[in-house]
Regions:
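Acidic, glycine-enriched loop/beta-strand segments at the rims
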Residues: 24-31, 43-55, 67-68, 351, ...
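Bacterial Sec-dependent N-terminal signal peptides
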Residues: 1-24
């Protein structure tokens, strides 16, 4: 009997131990949801709607409401913006952010390679629609920071390799989330180009004409394949077939290739959104025949140095004309009713993004069209206009807080909120001391010009045509200056912003001091 009882206890032991796997209900805790309200803001809901002294209310990663009179729940953290501007995050539609770079294949010899190297795929290695950016992606924190500083909070990225490049990935640039929250769509779009893959040495196509012919052949083969006319499974065509419902993006390049790509799309019923090269002003009449927005770069060419007559001979009239016309490209498209999105693709530094948009505005582009080209239009291209590109209820809480109008060169981006998470760049309470002031001391008049950034202003002092050497620092809202006039008289100044003035004291070399005001 004792042996029987012992046997029963031993048999029941595993089941008793297994109970520990399940968590006890006593450990479950209720998490209170905390709202965030941004009050007294100049709120840009989208490219055409702006509210003064407004409130934006968010919960977690979503916008709850906005307006002049918003009901704020009890469990809310409130941020008084004191007139600062809120803008939707910019959307980058054509990037390779965080995606593994393709590895260039080494040539095996001098004889051309005609056969493909990938079994079970299309007969040409440069057709790679099976590439998935989601499988090659690693969040690049430093690069994400550069994007956010420029105003970009959402990036559509892919591996820029091949004629058919596969699917892209839509990512929110949030350092405080993991992939489950950052990735908005792991199959956001399908990418194409006229450029061969660096991962293959296959010779064909060897020209733009060949690339165009190959792409047309792909669509003919896809149509034949999708009707079940081929028994052999082609993994590349299968992938392409599964991408037909995705937004189609095309990297066309220069010299009229934008129109060439659009014509291929029209032939096969594909609505490409085409990345051009900034010379679309040359093809306005042709572009007006198509309805999909074009994607235009902001990499305006630098002015040519023609001081060297030998070098000047190599600068063509075409190059000079493009240097002059490139900043007007967006305005010309807008005037002709051609919709467009801006891209950072091709910029050597993201820091010039807003500067170059400002140049386009100086050439006549409206600020609302410029903002739409960075927010609502790229969101529409990606079919995500109900989620990103604006700040309406149930949309993603992706926005930046700035000191003024976003395309003003003096404006500073204080913070960038992505997925409802704060990324701070400047102290919002820092007074803006920048400007040109006049200082009168001992019957002498000095001009003080303050430029630079909000946190690190740059100071220049002059007396008439004479430029004086100055040492300056800015800390805890105080501007400290030290300079000497032409007679060697030393002045040390400490001043603080007071409405439009800078008020403080000047200390002379003998130790005496007096109150001063720097007037704009």
């Amino acid at each position: 009997m004792k042996k029987l009882i012992l046997l029963i206890l031993l048999l029941g032991l595993p089941s008793l131990q297994a109970q520990d796997y399940f968590p006890a209900h006593s450990e479950v805790k209720t998490k209170q949801e905390v709202y965030k309200a941004f009050t007294n803001a100049t709120l840009h809901i989208d490219a055409t709607t702006t509210l003064e002294k407004a409130t934006l209310l968010i919960l977690n990663d979503k916008v709850v409401s906005y307006g002049l009179k918003v009901s704020i729940p009890a469990n809310t953290i409130t941020y008084d913006l004191n007139g600062a501007h809120i803008y939707p995050s910019f959307v980058e539609v054509f990037s390779d952010f965080g995606v593994e770079k393709p590895k260039r294949v080494s040539s095996s010899g001098r004889s051309p390679q005609y056969e493909p190297t990938r079994e079970g795929f299309y007969w040409n290695d440069h057709i790679r629609p099976d590439t998935e950016a989601a499988q090659l992606f690693s969040y690049a924190k430093k690069s994400a920071d550069d994007y956010r500083k420029a105003g970009v909070g959402i990036v559509n990225t892919h591996q820029s390799d091949g004629i058919a490049r596969g699917t892209g990935l839509l990512v929110a640039l949030d350092d405080h989330s993991d992939a489950s929250k950052r990735i908005i769509d792991d199959r956001s779009s399908a990418y194409f180009s006229f450029t061969k893959s660096v991962q293959s040495s296959q010779s064909y196509p060897g020209s733009l004409m060949g690339a165009t012919a190959l792409l047309r052949q792909v669509y003919h083969d896809l149509d034949w394949y999708s009707k079940g006319n081929i028994e052999t499974k082609d993994r590349a065509l299968e992938a392409l077939q599964n991408q037909r419902s995705l937004p189609q993006l095309f990297d066309a390049g220069a010299n009229g290739n934008t129109v060439r790509a659009l014509k291929i799309g029209r032939q096969f019923g594909v609505n490409y959104s085409v990345l051009g090269s900034g010379d679309e002003y040359n093809y306005v009449r042709e572009l007006k025949q198509f309805t999909t927005p074009v994607i235009i770069p902001l990499n305006f060419p630098k002015a040519y140095d023609l001081s060297d007559p030998v070098y000047a001979e190599y600068v063509s009239l075409k190059d000079m004309r493009h240097w002059y016309q490139a900043p007007s490209n967006a305005k010309i498209l807008s005037e002709h009713g051609i919709r467009f999105a801006f891209t950072t693709n091709g910029l050597t530094s993201l820091s010039v993004l807003r500067t170059n948009v400002s140049k386009a505005i100086e050439r006549g582009l409206s600020e609302s069209d410029a903002l739409a080209a960075l927010t609502t239009t790229p969101a529409e291209i990606l079919g995500k206009q109900s989620e990103i590109g604006a700040l309406k209820p149930k949309m993603k809480a992706n926005f930046m807080i700035s000191s003024g109008p976003i395309f003003d060169v003096k404006t500073t981006i204080f913070e960038h909120w992505v997925n409802g998470h704060q990324h701070v760049y400047e102290d919002r309470n820092t007074p803006d001391v920048r400007g040109e002031y006049t200082l009168n001391l001992n019957d002498e008049s000095f001009t003080i010009a303050i430029t630079g950034t909000l946190q690190k202003p740059t100071v220049k002092i002059s007396k008439g045509d004479e430029k004086l050497t100055v040492k300056s620092s800015f800390s805890s809202q105080w501007l400290n200056l030290s300079f000497s006039d032409s007679l060697g008289q030393l002045y040390r100044i400490a001043a603080k912003k007071d409405n439009t003035l800078l008020k403080g004291r000047v200390v002379y070399a003998n130790g005496n001091s007096t109150a001063i005001s720097l007037t704009p």
